[in-house]
Amino acid sequence: MTMEKKRYFSVMSEDRSPNLVTAEQNEELKNSSVSKDSQEDSLFVVDDSDIEEQTESNILENTNPVPHVHRLEYEEFESQIKSVVGTISSHAMNHLFKKYHDKQNYLKLAVQEYLQGIDENDTDIRIVGNSPDGNNSPNVHRKRIYEQEQDDLMSRLQRECQRSQDEEKKKSWNRFIGSLNVQAWATRPTTKPLKYLEKLELRRLMPKKLNVGKPTKEKTKFGDSSIIRIYTIPKYTEESGREIGRIPEDITRILVPLIDLDISSFYTTVMIDTEKRLSTGDSFYIQIDCYLSQNAFSGKELERSMSQSDQDLNALKRQKKMDTRTRFDFSTETNTEAILRLRQYSLSRFFQRLNIKPIPQKSDHADDINEASETPIIIDSENEDDHIVKEDHEQQNLDQLKQIMQANQQSELLDSLPETTKPPIFNFKLDLRKYQKHGLSWMLTREREIAVLETLSKNDDDDNDNDILTTQDKANIQERNDAFMNPLWDIFEWPKDTSMHKSESSPTEDRMDDNYFYANMYNGELSLTKPVIRSMVKGGILADEMGLGKTISTLALINSVPIDVMFEENKELEDKTIYASKTTLIIVPMSLLSQWQKEFDKANNNSNHKCFIYYGDSATTDLSPVLCNKKKDIPIVMITTYGTVLNEFTRISNRRDAKGFLPKIGLFSVKFFRIVLDEGHNIRNRTAKTSKAIYEILSNRKWVLTGTPVINRLDDLYSLVKFLELEPWSNFSYWKTFVTLPFEQRKISQTLDVVKSILEPIFIRRTKNMKQSNGKPLVELPPKEVVIEEVKFNEVEEKLYNWFKARASQSFKDGIKSGDLFKKYSQILTHILRLRQVCCHVDLVGSANEMEQELVDPNTDLSEANGESDSISMVNNVLDSYHADNNHDEKFKNNTEVRSVMFPLYEKIDLKESECSICTQSPIPLGEMALTPCGHAYCLNCVLEHFDFQEKNSQKPLCPNCREPISKYKIFKLRHRDTSVKEIRFHTKQEMEDPSQNFKFQLYLYDPTKTSSKIQCLINHLKILKEQSPNEQVVVFSQFSSYLDIIENELKIQISNDFVVYKFDGRLNMNERQKILENFSSQKHENKVMILLLSLKAGGVGLNLTTASRAFMMDPWWSPSVEDQAIDRLHRIGQNSNVKVTRFIMADSIETKMLKIQERKKQIGEAVGAEEDERRKRRIEEMQILFEDD
């Protein structure tokens, strides 16, 4: 027997009238939690004008409990059903959705059928309807019973839902944030005056229609309408209150988004009685008490908005790449982007109005930073008659940047670290200074070696109990090291509640104990918990000032933790990269390669610790056998150069596999335990090939050593952050959004605050002028004296300089006048180059040297500069013109006359008995001796000064001994070279006393047009130094190696017997450099001055030249920091003597103007200008300084 499965419930057919539900049930459903049209106790009201415009049909249409829904989304349908009936099976939900989603009363019909009965075990969901004679059926009685049960169940569900909402509302809270005193105005007359402390209500106006009667081209966006009106509070709840006024537009625009996003609530109180009832346009004063709601701190809506914004942005970028010719406006703001923008704008202005300021980060330098941002600087106007006082923003920027570099020195983390940490004695044999021990503690915490730190800090002989780490100290260190506050967030303190309205929904007692909250003013996000960034970076930036021993500090770290003890030997990583867990790779400039090896050998106290120098040999294409074998001779340190890394990367960069990985060759064949970049600012350009190569090398821990982390611009720091893989800042789009763009928009203080927060956990810098905790200097160095000595042009130099200066000034004036100065940029730079060459030596003019590359902008057109290729001929023309203007009698007519005068002088020279009749020096050194045609010997400097004295007095120069007329163009000098007697006899036709004896010197004609005033001053200083300190070691700095060549030749000619000269420049290979430095530092020559001619490019950084205490700077550079770095090669740890530096500057020349530019750079900072246009503008200003009239 077949049985049909039935449910004995009455079922509503699809064509059944919706009026089956009673009026009472309809009213209950209308007021239930699922109704969306309820406006009771809401800030959102309908514009009165819109209400008046509504037609009768619109009003009747709005009386429906639920609006007609077309193609309702399944998720919304499901959530509404579950909110009424609770849990429901998926196939039952699908049945209800398919059947009712397009019905007018879909919710009521679906709930009614479900409650009447669906057999959820029956997949066909068969429903038995009424029989034709249903009116006489016994089921009619059952139907009425179940309808009554349905009504009871619906009422119970509604009460439960309301109770749940009430409980949720009680759990939520509002907290007082401040009050606004506002002058409002009346929009309509009032029936009576307003009373003091009378309560009013703010309501956000939500018009139903926008642009009435006009076609709308685009979708209405969030926040398009900003209208807030003031209403009276009705005495009875069934009344709606009456509009009486409005608040100012600027405040409205701030409050509207806060209301729309349910961030804040506002309570209004009348503050001053109105003497009479208000008329339209009258003003009255109110106080708006402002509260932040719990919803403001949830962040869910903001996260969804940001996520959607990112998706929209990515989609737009993809679309833009697909069709670059489209006319679509990619700058169009999406609705979610508008929400974020309005939230950020409203909160920032809201806090500004309420005078809510963040609590400064704890730093001893915070006051200094604030002072730097508030102190006005008085500067001179270009117009002498117009003296004004203005704020020098650039000076503030530099001051703040300097404070940022030092602010972390007094951070809580650093203060909690011991100052007694030192490496194990069996690994490291040098003694560290106190600040180096403290720095080692910080470096160990950055590598998360807390256990090692605890062990090594107890090994100090002082046994200072105060430096022993407690359990709490270790926990605090771990917490600060692993998680630091997000730098985009600020901490705020809740203000005291001084409102006129005491909120009934104030925070709970446990929440009241929390006196602080956090805000991200970049996107308007709020939080009650400290927003932290979990950092996995093991490493940091050691930015101690030059000369404080960054090399020793790094070697101390390596010897404290030489290997990765947590790694199982020979275990491969997930990406199949071999892990060199026992080797630290140190990448250095080539000039420092031997010095690092030497420092390692000096510090190493473990015979098993080896240092390996890697040259990129073809024999070591795979480093895994060398660094990952099971033998004991694995080097703990491998040193290589930036050039080696670049060469290897260039060879293999085009051989990436399908996944983009480089082939496992050379430095890229293993993952190192640790990487150290010495002079890390070499990778400051993130787009340079060297930087890209460095980024590709894998390691577990990374360190950057640099004394100058910022050189040209603030973005120099980004490359260091990218190398360290500091998330999220290593993502350039993130860095650009929060650092680069705000900085370019001149939001300096805001940007530097972000940079300070980024650097604080990974950055440490100590300077020589810092004090220790006991008040003593961080490091006691001998005094340093820098002296500027102005040198005057000689006659020929002055003539040539003035000729080039006239051409340069004219080009500059023409460029200014025509407005195309940038087009003449390269030409003007070439003129500046010529002027600097003349200041150094006239032979440099037109020479191919590195000055050309330094001064000419590589991005400019060099076509005009190439016209200067015939500079040598121009110099000769100028010199010929000079000679033509002078008396021909002062010079020899030809070489025959020169020989006829010079060769007879050989017999008159007695080197041992020679004496200068001007200064009485005897004997006269061979290199200094000068002879007149009459055969009298003098010191060259003495006779030249004699010429100058005679010319100043308008007298004809005469020989001091015989009073014969003499000329500076008829002076002979001596040099170390043998001269044959036969040659002399051939020219003189005279018999010699001893024809077999050759002369040990050679005479030659002195040419004053080929001398350099600077070189002559240098030689004079060296001669004096030889007399005062015969065994002195001297360093001579110059920017240009070709100039050093000329200096070397002059020194060999004039003073070669008393001096030992070495030259160190970029043309030397590594072995030659090492040999020169060893000879200069270690070899001693009795009674001889040792001179090192040093190019700043090759040896301006990293070298240790503490054996020398005297230095001469032959030419200035645009950047003062370059010269400071050079001087610090001498004035550093290990220097025991007073350091004296002499800077030679040509008087009344471009070099004196360069000193002004250097001072200007010190004042405004070299990292202030971020945009290329801004930097170009600064260069033009510097050119104006160079060409201004004295």
Curated annotation (Swiss-Prot):
Disordered: annotated segments: 1-41
InterPro entries: Helicase_ATP-bd, Helicase_C-like, HIRAN, P-loop_NTPase, SNF2-like_sf, SNF2/RAD54-like_C, SNF2_N, SNF2_RAD54_helicase_TF
Residue pairs linked by disulfide bridges in the UniProt entry: none
EC numbers for this chain: 3.6.4.-
Record localization: Cytoplasm; Nucleus
The keyword Glycosyltransferase is assigned to this record: no
Domain Helicase ATP-binding stretches: 531-727
Primary location recorded for the protein, binned into one broad class: cytoplasm
SUPFAM superfamilies hit by this protein: P-loop containing nucleoside triphosphate hydrolases (SSF52540), RING/U-box (SSF57850)
Coiled coil spans: none
The protein's role, per its UniProt record: Probable helicase, member of the UBC2/RAD6 epistasis group. Functions with DNA repair protein RAD18 in error-free postreplication DNA repair. Involved in the maintenance of wild-type rates of instability of simple repetitive sequences such as poly(GT) repeats. Seems to be involved in maintaining a balance which acts in favor of error-prone non-homologous joining during DNA double-strand breaks repairs.
Protein name: DNA repair protein RAD5
Upper classification of the organism: Eukaryota, Fungi, Dikarya, Ascomycota, Saccharomycotina
